[in-house]
């Protein structure tokens, strides 16, 4: 549980920082929502069935995860509590102003970055943790590169 909460906090902080960088502002709730998305997206390649799944498939699943979390949290934060954290009602194809096709596509293309960031955070935090790699087990010397993830993404690997 401690590992999940650590990743949740790390990924939430990364999300808030990116939102401030690109939007100029964020909301405290985005620490929770962004962290949840990071943990759930990171969980994709923790499932044995997806260990070697193509990055494109992981990106599709990840984008769907983010859309579901965004929709549910948007309904709670924006519609129910009236916090007005975001509003996509002026976007074509929006659903209750909480999600829209344009941002779904954006999440799809951002997903390789999210996958890489979560895997890199795991590597940085637990690189030499024997509980993760077993007694005497050794992690890779460095995490894989963001360039290689996008290379696999655009080549369908």
Model-derived regions: residue spans:
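Aromatic-rich, lipid-facing transmembrane alpha helices and their immediate juxtamembrane interface loops
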Residues: 1-157
């Amino acid at each position: 549980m401690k590992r999940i909460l650590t990743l949740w906090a790390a990924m939430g902080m990364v999300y808030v920082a990116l939102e401030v960088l690109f939007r100029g502002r964020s909301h405290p709730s985005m620490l929770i929502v962004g962290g949840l998305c990071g943990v759930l997206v990171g969980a994709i390649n923790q499932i044995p069935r997806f260990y070697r799944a193509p990055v494109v498939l992981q990106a599709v699943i990840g984008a769907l995860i983010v859309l579901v979390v965004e929709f549910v949290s948007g309904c709670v934060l924006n519609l129910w509590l009236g916090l007005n954290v975001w509003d996509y009602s002026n976007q074509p194809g929006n659903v209750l102003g909480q999600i829209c096709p344009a941002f779904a596509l954006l999440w799809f293309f951002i997903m390789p970055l999210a996958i890489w960031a979560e895997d890199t955070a795991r590597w940085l935090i637990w690189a030499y943790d024997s509980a993760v790699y077993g007694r005497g087990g050794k992690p890779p010397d460095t995490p894989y590169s963001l360039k290689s993830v996008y290379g696999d993404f655009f080549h369908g690997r």
